[in-house]
């Protein structure tokens, strides 16, 4: 019995450390998902250096409290999988959201974004953000538009003087 208790204590300590180091944590229900589908999601997430694991809710609850994420406690019900990203803030939410569109049994419940507890709405908002490249393109276009307008105006002024 002592070995089993020690193993659980070790799991809580390990998960607490992961929670503290994570940039993003996404928790989702996987009820009714086949092993093959869960494995394919795991491999997709692994390509982006994102850990996916299923923990018992009691272990997840204790680790969340130890990491200072007490507000997660009410959402820790039912079969949950935990995706943890240490590098990219947006990737786990995007990948799981895309996967959930194909597999209706997957439901994002809550998570943590840069050390702040986030509900389903916040995680979905993060998942629906355009990619970094798209945002940079939009920013560049927005910055260049006034310059373009000035150039067109100057050209028109030069043409009227000629």
From Swiss-Prot:
Which superkingdom? Answer: Bacteria
Any single GO molecular-function term of the entry would be: large ribosomal subunit rRNA binding
What cellular-component terms does GO give this entry?
large ribosomal subunit
> What are its GO biological-process terms?
translation
What Pfam families does the database record attribute to this sequence?
Ribosomal_L10
Q: Which SUPFAM superfamilies match?
A: Ribosomal protein L10-like
Give the residues annotated as coiled coil: none
Subunit description: Part of the ribosomal stalk of the 50S ribosomal subunit. The N-terminus interacts with L11 and the large rRNA to form the base of the stalk. The C-terminus forms an elongated spine to which L12 dimers bind in a sequential fashion forming a multimeric L10(L12)X complex.
In Swiss-Prot or TrEMBL terms, this protein is called: Large ribosomal subunit protein uL10
Which species?
Answer: Acholeplasma laidlawii (strain PG-8A)
> What lineage does UniProt assign to this protein's organism?
Bacteria, Bacillati, Mycoplasmatota, Mollicutes, Acholeplasmatales
């Amino acid at each position: 019995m002592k070995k089993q208790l020690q193993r659980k204590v070790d799991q809580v300590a390990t998960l607490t450390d992961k929670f503290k180091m994570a940039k993003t944590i996404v928790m989702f229900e996987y009820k009714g998902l086949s092993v093959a589908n869960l494995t394919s999601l795991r491999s997709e997430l692994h390509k982006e250096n994102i850990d996916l694991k299923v923990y018992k809710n009691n272990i997840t609850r204790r680790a969340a409290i130890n990491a200072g994420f007490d507000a997660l406690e009410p959402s820790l019900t039912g079969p949950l999988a935990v995706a943890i990203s240490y590098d990219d803030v947006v990737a786990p939410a995007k990948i799981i959201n895309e996967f959930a569109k194909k597999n209706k049994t997957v439901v994002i419940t809550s998570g943590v974004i840069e050390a702040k507890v986030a509900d389903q709405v916040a995680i979905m908002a993060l998942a629906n953000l355009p990619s970094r490249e798209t945002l940079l393109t939009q920013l560049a276009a927005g910055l260049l538009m006034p310059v373009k307008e000035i150039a067109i105006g100057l050209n028109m002024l030069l043409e009227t003087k000629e």
